[in-house]
């Protein structure tokens, strides 16, 4: 385990800007505690986990339950300074053995949503709305614990969030066809506090550091999946990776006055569709994918007229992408070109070469211009 541990609900670098932890990180920690208790009879408290980027936060347990053939543990989510609707929710994991050879099964308990439509991160309707990275984190930690005790990793993991169905009404889940509760989310495990000025300041500081080091190429990504895809191409030093997230405008406007030779913007299809539309803040609460815009792109790419209604009524941008891919139409390339035009327009002639990389949810590159 990494020797550098970070107490949960603390920002290790900026005490004035408190980071939080995702529902996925909380679910993983609760699952580790529950499985450990199921095997040993004792709950680790606090319980530490390793996040995808190597951080090791520790979480205090808010709930423990041990019964015949099952164990439960709960953690209260602290979103730090982010105005997250799930702040204060209790994330509970119940773990019990599954039949031999089953592997690890995830189920949605009270307050956790169920996927009913295609085009989401969980592609199979009927599955629990527990996204891929939290699933992987829980799977890896359960496999490691079971291996330590010489046991097969055949388990049922049920994640529940009391009050989650009410919380979900304040999210996009009902519109996306996720019913019954919230989603268990997160790609890094860390919730960055939503403070525009502070986040944008950190972007500016990152550009300043890169310039001071003589770095000629920087990367701004909307998330860890697209960042990893771009890094597989370039392997840039850490100081060349800007903490862009949803704030594409924060990167571009600062580079306009403080140019670096080359900028790569990498992001998922939906985020970069919004950039292509002209949005510079890509957060879901402040910009939305315009299905009419996507239809115009698809029509220019050769989509038949009878696809228009299906695109306009699509649930998500990813569903539109899959519809067009199914008939051999590429809209990721045109979206990348339009996103690049938005970036160049924002730079207003600054000497910055711009590259756009569009990825899918698995990190596969769909377009690169």
Curated annotation (Swiss-Prot):
Top EC class, one word: transferase
GO-annotated molecular function: cobalt-precorrin-5B C1-methyltransferase activity
Xref: Gene3D superfamilies: CbiD-like (3.30.2110.10)
Enzyme Commission (EC) number: 2.1.1.195
Keywords on record: Cobalamin biosynthesis, Methyltransferase, S-adenosyl-L-methionine, Transferase
Signal peptide: none
Keyword S-adenosyl-L-methionine: yes
InterPro entries: CbiD (IPR002748), CbiD_sf (IPR036074)
Recorded catalytic activity of this chain's protein: Co-precorrin-5B + S-adenosyl-L-methionine = Co-precorrin-6A + S-adenosyl-L-homocysteine
GO biological process terms held by the UniProt record: anaerobic cobalamin biosynthetic process; methylation
PANTHER family, alphabetized: COBALT-PRECORRIN-5B C(1)-METHYLTRANSFERASE
Family: Belongs to the CbiD family.
The protein's name in its UniProt record: Cobalt-precorrin-5B C(1)-methyltransferase
Species for this entry: Brucella melitensis biotype 2 (strain ATCC 23457)
Lineage: Bacteria, Pseudomonadati, Pseudomonadota, Alphaproteobacteria, Hyphomicrobiales
Gene name linked to the record: cbiD
């Amino acid at each position: 385990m990494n020797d550098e541990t970070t107490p949960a609900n603390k920002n290790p670098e900026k005490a004035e800007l408190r980071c939080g932890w995702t529902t996925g990180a909380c679910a993983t920690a609760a699952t580790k505690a529950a499985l450990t208790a199921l095997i040993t009879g004792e709950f680790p408290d606090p319980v530490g986990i390793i996040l995808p980027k190597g951080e090791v936060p520790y979480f205090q347990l808010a709930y423990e339950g041990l019964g015949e053939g099952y164990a439960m543990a709960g953690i209260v989510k602290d979103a730090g300074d982010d105005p997250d609707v799930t702040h204060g929710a209790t994330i509970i994991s119940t773990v019990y053995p599954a039949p031999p050879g089953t592997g690890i099964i995830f189920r949605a308990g009270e307050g956790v949503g169920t996927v009913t439509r295609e085009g989401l991160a969980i592609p199979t309707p009927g599955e629990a709305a527990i996204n891929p990275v939290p699933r992987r984190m829980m799977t890896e930690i359960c496999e490691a614990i079971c291996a330590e005790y010489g046991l097969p990793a055949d388990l049922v993991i049920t994640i529940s969030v009391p009050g989650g169905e009410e919380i979900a009404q304040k999210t996009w889940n009902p519109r996306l066809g996720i019913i019954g509760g919230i989603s268990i989310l997160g790609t890094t495990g860390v919730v960055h506090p939503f403070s525009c000025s502070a986040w944008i300041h950190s972007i500016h500081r990152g550009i300043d550091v890169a310039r001071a080091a003589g770095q000629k190429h920087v990367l701004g990504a909307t998330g860890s999946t697209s960042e990893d895809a771009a890094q597989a191409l370039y392997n840039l030093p850490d100081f060349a990776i800007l903490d862009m997230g949803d704030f594409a405008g924060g990167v571009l406007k600062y580079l306009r006055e403080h140019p670096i030779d080359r900028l790569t913007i990498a992001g998922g299809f939906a985020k970069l569709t919004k950039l292509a539309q002209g949005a510079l803040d890509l957060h879901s609460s402040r910009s939305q994918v315009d299905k009419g815009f996507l239809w115009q792109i698809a029509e220019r790419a050769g989509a038949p007229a009878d696809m228009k209604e299906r695109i306009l009524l699509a649930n998500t941008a990813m569903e539109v992408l899959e519809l067009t891919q199914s008939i051999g139409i590429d809209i990721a390339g045109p979206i990348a070109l339009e996103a690049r035009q938005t970036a160049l327009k924002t730079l207003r002639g600054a000497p910055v070469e711009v590259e756009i990389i569009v990825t899918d949810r698995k990190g596969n590159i769909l377009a690169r211009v």
